[in-house]
Amino acid sequence: MRNFLPLFCFIIVFSVQAQTGLKDTIIRETGTYNSLLIGTANGLYQLTEKAAPVLLWSGGMVKKILISPQGYYVLTDQGILFSRDLANWEYRNQGLPIKVLKEIVQGKKQFIQKVQDLKDLEYNPSDPAMMVTATKDGVYLSRDGGLSWSNVGMPPSKTNGIKAVAVADLNGPVVLASHSIYGVYALSVAEKPAATGNPASAKSSPAQKWLPLNQGLELHETTENSDEVADILVYRNSGKTRIFALQSFRERLYELDWDTKWFTLLYKGENDFKAQDGLVGFYNSLWFVQQGNLTQFSLNDRTSSNSENLIVAPTTDQIMKAVRKAELLIPEPTMSAAFLFPSEGEPSSALPLSLSELWLLREPFRQYREKPYIRTALNREGFYLPVNHALEEKSLNRYIHILDTKKLNMVVIDMKDDYGRLRFVPQNPEIAAKGRVFKPIDLEQFVSTMKAHGAYLVARVVVFKDPELYKKEGGKYAVWDSVLNSPWQGYYENAEGTRIDYDEKWVDPYSEEVWAYIATISQELHQRGFDEIQFDYIRFPTDGVNLSQTRFRWRDPGMDAESAILSFLRYIRGHVEAPISIDIYGANGWYRTGARTGQEVEVLARYVDVICPMYYPSHFEQTFLANNPPELRPYRIYYLGTLRAMTIARNQAIIRPYIQAFYLNVAYDRKYYNDDYVLRQLLGVQNAGNFGYTYWNNIGRYDEIPLPETRLTAGPELLFKSSNID
């Protein structure tokens, strides 16, 4: 234990001396660190040289530790904590929006009020009492050190997705915010806003205009939008305010020229993809966390925009070893850390180095203590088996042959299908009372046969799209039509104006009775041999010209779409002792947003073990990532999509994409669909870490599945091979 803190002291002092040229003056001015704060998935700890770790707070995940002249601020999943002395703590959440989660305890409803998930927290170096934070769809400003917060709106977008915020004095106070899709915006906040913490008042007044600041930022390929900015840093040094930005998914670092509103590129790496986040300033250097290492960028000479100015700290290995030692002493995943120099009196006399997003330093999917089912679900490779093909031995044998010859180890099969029908005979009478059995398989025989061939069995359960439950008890569970006062049915109108109903009927995602029905089905399927339960259509309806007429009668006050999904998953997690996976839209895995569906990967990853994005190339805009050579589009989508989703999820859940093993009559597929189309998707997943995938063909035709020797040995030459289709 006595060797632990000196390691940290050596790391920072040596690194600063080596990169800034300040040499012994650093040691004379600051001495060594007197303590280290560690934020984990479950709390905040203090480590000192002579004592065991001290638990300071144990209320939840610590995302960021911010030390200002005001005191110590801690960004958590319960909101914002504040202390002046690390001994006495208080919440500073007044005015921040609240989400309501529903729990069912011994058959009775209970409600938990939590601050909405906060994305970032920063203060104005010129006025530390001025602070800024953000939810997914609102920016909040404080002028009194976080004692109260006001909503100043969000960048002009109908889509949620705020990632980072900052506040600076730029001839008056200015708030900066990055949106995952639409880039960076700025808002002058010289006057105190009239809006309150109520989300309904989130619109800026006419005097408050969000100004786009995307000039100079690298665009997301084949789009008109800049790629996501992970963090914005306001760095005040020698009386000068400078603003820096770091992109999330590519090695790009910028400085903003406020006068010209232009981002100048400071550094560009060579990797197609590299996750990075947690940008801070320390002794005339920028520090940030990349995959596998802590990185420094010296500000002493920025005439070059290549890797010459990027210096991976020579003590990176020691830092990572120290973090691992901290995790041995504190057996919880480390999320953030703050190194504290000794100070006399207030924190303002200390020189802190605060690091966040430390999950990036760890190998993916190793938090088995926190989520034990991840180990079971990892590295599963398989296909979706249409349940009708499992009814007879002859048709099932075709898929056993595919399983064996293609060297796959997983089968996904419907047990509650898209029409709400049960494809097995339930033993629990509560299931039979709500569901309808239709052409069931012999469950015990099926499980026995497939396990004899080494199959990991996944039961697909369609959740909130359920025509059978929709019509039960006079529509008791249905999403309701507020105009017609009857169960809601989405429809569209064709060119002639004729109404055409969508082939979907939805039950209310807020209904705890629907949750219990799904949980009971899941429990029985696991008990009867399924290894994993996979939920599809775990979302709200998204289609229909009459979508605005939907009413959710089971909704309790304060709940929204996200809190309904989270409440459902919390309920399931407490009732099902097996790996849980969910299917999501490809766009919700690509961007940090739950737009349209309520599927926020960043939040959902805490509650499930596997997330399965449907990155089907046919379902994206046909020009999306179709830059030259266009044949590589399927590879790009799956390679980058898998890595992006892993980053958004912070590696808290396995990303196991569905691979498109079917042809769709759209422009790109008409020209390029062939065996290589499927193989390129697979190679994208494999090159993104190879943690698992599922082939999807809803009629069960898998002629295009690559042979094992092809998928294991195909290299760059395959990726660039012509499709031979004109």
Task: List each language-model region with its residue ranges.
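Conserved Ser/Thr-centered positions that define the repeating blades of beta-propeller domains
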Residues: 47, 83, 142-143, 186-190, ...
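Substrate-binding cleft of secreted/luminal carbohydrate-active enzymes
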Residues: 334, 341-343, 347-348, 356, ...
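Aromatic-lined carbohydrate-binding/catalytic grooves of carbohydrate-active enzymes
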Residues: 406-440
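Glycoside hydrolase catalytic-domain groove-lining segments
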Residues: 553-666, 712
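Loop/turn residues immediately N-terminal
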Residues: 41-45, 77-81, 87, 137-140, ...
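Active-site-adjacent "subsite" loops/lids of carbohydrate-active enzymes
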Residues: 371-391, 464-524
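Catalytic domains of carbohydrate-active enzymes, especially glycoside hydrolases
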Residues: 397-420, 527-532, 610, 688-691
